[in-house]
């Protein structure tokens, strides 16, 4: 099992302090509608947030609250979970994307099966006819965008986004217009982040310890010293 959230109990305050790995950008928050069963499970709205000493109110990831079977007592949360290596919802997403890649007019059926299972209305082909321009300037079909958005909702904060972008041949640009923008603006390294498709930064560097111990590795991955 694994712990997705760093957490601790603050007895003087009578509340938990937890530190999610991610801050959702505004375009992610907008993906979640009120009718979506996942909205109140995956997101914590109106959360009191502290970033580098600056305090504010915003939206946080709250997807992994913890498996009760891993609790050591009834009062202390440990936020521990059994990682799901593969879920049935991923099969619907894979099916939708695979059908679309074989035929750009296909893929709507498995997409709608997942959407309706999550409380969303089914889409018609007329809903996804128009091309969509992404934040990084990439233009894709409306259907492929709907498939990507559904994957973004279902797989939120599960570590698949990097691999999705590589598979789709897309870059990304940080959307600084987040619910936490006033706090993010005070932390310079959080303000800008842009990588084009095919950037060497999509591949992690080889750890220095591995390079030192095994000279057969040769040179470091492109883009790293």
Each model region followed by its residue ranges:
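His/Glu-based metal-binding/catalytic segments typifying zinc-dependent metallopeptidases
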Residues: 1-27
């Amino acid at each position: 099992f694994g712990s997705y959230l760093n957490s601790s109990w603050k007895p003087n305050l009578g509340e938990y302090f937890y530190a999610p790995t991610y801050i959702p950008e505004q375009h992610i928050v907008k993906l979640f509608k009120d009718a979506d069963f996942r909205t109140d499970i995956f997101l914590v709205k109106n959360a009191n947030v502290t970033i580098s000493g600056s305090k504010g109110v915003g939206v946080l990831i709250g997807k992994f609250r913890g498996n009760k079977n891993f609790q050591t007592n009834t009062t202390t949360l440990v936020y521990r979970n059994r990682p799901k290596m593969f879920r049935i919802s991923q099969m619907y997403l894979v099916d939708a994307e695979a059908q679309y890649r074989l035929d750009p007019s296909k893929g709507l059926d498995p997409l709608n099966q997942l959407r309706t299972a999550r409380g969303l209305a089914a889409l018609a082909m007329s809903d996804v006819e128009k091309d969509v321009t992404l934040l990084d300037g990439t233009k894709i079909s409306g259907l492929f965008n709907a498939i990507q958005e559904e994957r973004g909702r279902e797989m939120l904060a599960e570590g698949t986004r990097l691999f999705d972008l590589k598979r789709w041949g897309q870059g990304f640009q940080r959307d600084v217009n987040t619910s936490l923008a006033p706090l993010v603006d005070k932390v310079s390294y959080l303000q800008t982040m842009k990588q084009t498709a095919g950037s060497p930064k999509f591949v992690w560097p080889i750890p220095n310890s591995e390079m030192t111990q095994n000279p057969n590795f040769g040179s470091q991955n492109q883009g790293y010293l």
